[in-house]
Amino acid sequence: MNRASLKRSKILHMALMGTSDPSGEAEASQEKPFVLRALQIALVVSLYWVTSISMVFLNKYLLDSPSLRLDTPIFVTFYQCLVTVLLCKGLSSLATCCPGTVDFPALHLDLKVARSVLPLSVVFIGMITFNNLCLKYVGVAFYNVGRSLTTVFNVLLSYLLLKQTTSFYALLTCSVIIGGFWLGVDQEGAEGTLSWTGTLFGVLASLCVSLNAIYTKKVLPAVDGSIWRLTFYNNANACVLFLPLLLALGELRALLAFPQLGSAHFWAMMTLGGLFGFAIGYVTGLQIKFTSPLTHNVSGTAKACAQTVLAVLYYEEAKSFLWWTSNMMVLGGSSAYTWVRGREMKKTQEEPHPRENEKSNMEV
């Protein structure tokens, strides 16, 4: 295998497994006092939780509120992408006009770069669209279970694309997640609240999340490794690609007939949803920066648990013991997978390389 193939294989492996270089994190942790770093981590994690949970509840309102009655999920997603593009361009202009005010890269739409990002944009559209469609057809309480197969797809794609085998214990945690998913589907059906359409969209969203991680790593060099440039091009491409979908699905006609089209409250909620969509990318990166990818996964799992409890309380739903068991299986399996992968990566890092051993033996 040549150097280029090895590099591509490493990139795909990092994308699927969520690994990163721990040396930078270790150095950063040594620079600041423990109390200050702990406070920063607590604030960043809290910001991530508030932003993520608020975005889910707000999107549920926009997509499936009885008081709103807006049946245009593609338009809602399109508008959120448009808000992100405008925010990126606005921050870029501010950074250019007032240096030092905000740290943001200069953004200029380059069609060549846009074409390079296009494969990722197609996957990105699938990810955010299927996410919103899943949320439209299922309750917030079941939303995490409906989208719980991302880890399973990560393992599957790592084998299909990298021929990377997974340890027995990691596969065991995946089987717990799958078991929790099917138990959740069964219990939703028993309670008469199951939407097979929403469940299918959740599975497709999970697949797209895994593919998005792969393509993000592959496309980053085209935007000089800048996440903000990638966000700008990704959402700009999405806005263009959404237009034929809006026409084909008749959502523009439905929007023109919407009674609250001229309501300031409606557009305020739509814009707020776009702001949360923009912010979640930033706070996710911030949480990974101040902790690690593995800690981010643990935080996401705990956040999902809190979100489920809040949804049940807010919507005043009564859930069976087996329904809660399915959620605990999904969350527990996800946490266990993160823990197993963390131990395996730590063990791999601690093991000396064969060539180093040979060299030391020769020196002796």
Swiss-Prot record:
Catalytic function, reaction form: GMP(out) + GDP-beta-L-fucose(in) = GMP(in) + GDP-beta-L-fucose(out)
GO biological process: GDP-fucose import into Golgi lumen
An example molecular function term from Gene Ontology annotations: GDP-fucose transmembrane transporter activity
Cellular localization per UniProt: Golgi apparatus membrane
Gene Ontology cellular component terms for the protein in this record: Golgi apparatus; Golgi membrane
Keywords noted in UniProt: Golgi apparatus, Membrane, Sugar transport, Transmembrane, Transmembrane helix, Transport
Pfam families for this protein: TPT (PF03151)
Transmembrane intervals: 34-56, 76-98, 111-130, 140-162, 167-185, 195-214, 227-249, 264-286
Chain positions covered by the region annotation Disordered: 345-364
InterPro entries named among the record's database cross-references: Sugar_P_trans_dom, TPT_transporter
UniProt record similarity statement: Belongs to the TPT transporter family. SLC35C subfamily.
Function, as annotated: Antiporter specific for GDP-l-fucose and depending on the concomitant reverse transport of GMP. Involved in GDP-fucose import from the cytoplasm into the Golgi lumen.
Name of the molecule in the record: GDP-fucose transporter 1
Gene: SLC35C1
